[in-house]
């Protein structure tokens, strides 16, 4: 895909990740990991390639996150508010505010989502000053046949907040390809992994 790469493979497998990266190290891992949607959205739409159940999600996190830390300088991910406890304590938490509400939980619609950050803030590390760590976003995502597509303008904001022009982005759960599109639109390269051949 021009300067980008996409590989059909498993981001919880060290050999597959090494093959995708081919010795390069990413400046940023930006991803929207599985949410544990089996028996609901994923199963109905044949997306359950990760055995994406709540029971299995902890194992997915335990495998992909350490691998991502070996190939990327920092990691930024959107776990979904109900899955945040499955992840190790982050270095920082940014916030995505969605006034209309996203995702029905046990207490109703949640109006914000955590963005977990691991590693140093790239802007502060490069002495570029402090930048906002919250975004208010009301744009609806285009589904593209995928259950959890992120709005492209939100994803672009997150990419520009956490990386620089020309840098390399690693995406372990490519899904509908939003990270590749955002990388193309913002002048970055993206190496993406997706288990589903679709």
Model-derived features: positions:
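Core catalytic lobe of class I
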Residues: 1-192, 196
């Amino acid at each position: 895909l021009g300067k980008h790469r996409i590989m059909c493979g498993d981001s919880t497998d060290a050999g597959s990740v090494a093959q995708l990266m081919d010795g390069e190290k990413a400046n940023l891992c930006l991803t929207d990991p599985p949410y544990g949607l089996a028996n609901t959205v994923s199963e109905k739409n044949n997306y359950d390639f990760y055995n994406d159940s709540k029971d299995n999600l902890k194992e997915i996190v335990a495998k992909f996150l350490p691998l991502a830390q070996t190939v990327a300088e920092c990691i930024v991910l959107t776990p979904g508010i109900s899955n945040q406890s499955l992840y190790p304590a982050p270095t920082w938490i940014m916030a995505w505010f969605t006034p209309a509400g996203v995702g029905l939980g046990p207490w109703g619609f949640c109006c914000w989502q955590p963005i977990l950050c691991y590693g140093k803030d790239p802007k502060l590390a490069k002495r570029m000053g402090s930048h906002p760590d919250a975004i208010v976003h009301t744009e609806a995502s285009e589904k593209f046949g995928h259950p959890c597509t992120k709005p492209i303008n939100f994803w672009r904001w997150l990419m520009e907040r956490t990386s620089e022009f020309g840098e390399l982005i690693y995406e372990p759960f490519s899904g509908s390809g939003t990270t590749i599109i955002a990388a193309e639109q913002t002048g970055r390269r993206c190496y993406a992994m997706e288990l589903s051949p679709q």
